[in-house]
Amino acid sequence: MNTLPPITVSTADRDRLFAVLDNFKGDSDQIDYLYDELARAQFVEADAMPEDVVTLGSRLRFRNEASGKEHERVLTLPHETQTVSDAISILTPAGAALLGLKVGDEIRWPHQGHFLRLQLLSVSRT
């Protein structure tokens, strides 16, 4: 059984994401996945967001558990990926999976016939 970790999303991020999703033309599987993630999220006001939880604009460090490789990225909206160094779009599988996680959480999901598993190592606000 694959139990997903709880996620917390700010109401500001929720509103920005729904605005993007409602107007996005692209990969419907990825859009559906992000809608599913938002459907299971707990929403809080931005000023009440815990510092160790991933939000849009967060700089985060995570590890791919299969390869052991660590990555440091900034979670962005799709149109921001060209202007932000080390950006990861919220519309990528990893970006959507990391939204709302807290430091120490792991998430595992099926992807192209196998499972991907990421562990969130650190978060800082940019």
Which residues are covered by each model-predicted region?
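Short, acidic/hydrophobic/Gly-rich beta-strand patch recurrent on exposed beta strands
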Residues: 73-77, 87-89
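FKBP-type peptidyl-prolyl cis-trans isomerase
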Residues: 54-66, 72-74, 103-124
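N-terminal intrinsically disordered, low-complexity, charge/repeat-rich segments that act as generic
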Residues: 1-53
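Histidine- and aromatic-rich ligand-binding microenvironments
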Residues: 47, 93, 114
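Short, structured beta-strand/loop micro-motifs enriched in basic residues and often containing a Trp
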Residues: 42, 82-93
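Short basic alpha-helical hairpin corresponding to helix-turn-helix/winged-helix-like nucleic-acid-binding
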Residues: 34, 58, 86
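Beta-rich strand-turn-strand
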Residues: 94-106
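Short, charged, intrinsically disordered terminal tails
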Residues: 2, 124-126
